[in-house]
Design a protein with these regions (language model features):
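Membrane-interface extramembranous regions
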Residues: 1-156
């Protein structure tokens, strides 16, 4: 396996580990701070799918219960995709497209909650855009080297 192919696989693995760890960190109460008074979701609101577990991971990234679960799933898929070149390439391409669209949605005020399910505003926008750019580079831009074909014709 050549270096370019391994780079695609390592990209899927690193993004997978990053998202799995961030998703798991969202369940650690000491790493999630409550929103400020008068914030996007007041602490005293009735629980719904959006406000369940809402807080700021590391004080920076808005998150909630569903967002943490999605990050763990996306991360797990990346870790599994690492096992093959085709899987890693497909993961990197799909991740780049999906997370670029999510970053764009985060810039639009009407879509900053992923249709009322997950927060994608604030620091989530640049984080999603940055990871989409990295995955896009390894999924689309970096040339994929294939094994040279062997000439199997009989010699005369």
């Amino acid at each position: 396996m050549n270096r370019e192919n391994m780079a695609q696989r390592y990209c899927a693995l690193i993004i997978g580990i990053l998202f799995a760890v961030i998703g798991l960190a969202g369940f650690v109460p000491g790493l999630v701070s409550l929103p400020p008074t008068g914030g996007a979701i007041p602490v005293d609101t009735s629980p719904d799918i959006y406000s369940a577990g809402f807080g700021y991971l590391f004080g920076l990234f808005p998150t909630n219960l569903l967002h943490n679960i999605v990050r763990i799933v996306v991360g797990s898929v990346g870790i599994v995709a690492y096992t093959s070149l085709g899987g890693a390439r497909l993961y990197n391409r799909g991740f780049a497209i999906a997370y670029a669209l999510i970053a764009i949605m985060g810039l639009l005020p009407v879509a900053q909650t992923t249709f009322g399910l997950m927060p994608i505003f604030g620091n989530n926008v640049w984080f999603n855009a940055l990871t989409a750019i990295v995955a896009g580079y390894f999924g689309f831009v970096q040339p994929t080297q294939t094994m040279p074909q062997m000439n199997t014709s009989p010699r005369s």
